[in-house]
């Protein structure tokens, strides 16, 4: 789906920045989407970094007081800096050509 959207938008001959791409519960994943965005030379913005007050770990339309989701929507880190999913951190680092010490965090709750 994204590929077709990118093809259509390329016709504008303008720089592209994708701001709404990461939504784990809808099938968007760092390991699948970052390489595509990189290959297409499309910038991307990721909403949510640390699980906290903005509650971007919750999916759109979440009901206040509902149980915590098994799968986070956006965020990638717990408040203490531990990765939500160390494999995702490795995928992000691979896309960026960097490495960190974050990949050895706790497992998903």
What are these regions (language model features)?
Residues 1-109:
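Substrate-binding clefts and catalytic carboxylate motifs of secreted carbohydrate-active enzymes
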């Amino acid at each position: 789906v994204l590929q077709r959207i990118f093809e259509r938008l390329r016709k504008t001959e303008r720089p592209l920045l994708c701001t709404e791409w990461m939504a784990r519960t809808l099938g968007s994943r760092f390991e699948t989407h970052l390489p595509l965005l990189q290959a297409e030379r499309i910038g991307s913005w990721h909403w949510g970094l640390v699980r906290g007050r903005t509650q971007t770990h919750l999916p759109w339309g979440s009901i206040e007081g509902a149980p915590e989701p098994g799968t986070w929507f956006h965020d990638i880190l717990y408040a203490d800096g531990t990765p939500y999913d160390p494999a995702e951190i490795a995928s992000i680092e691979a896309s960026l050509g960097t490495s960190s010490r974050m990949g050895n965090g706790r497992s998903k709750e």
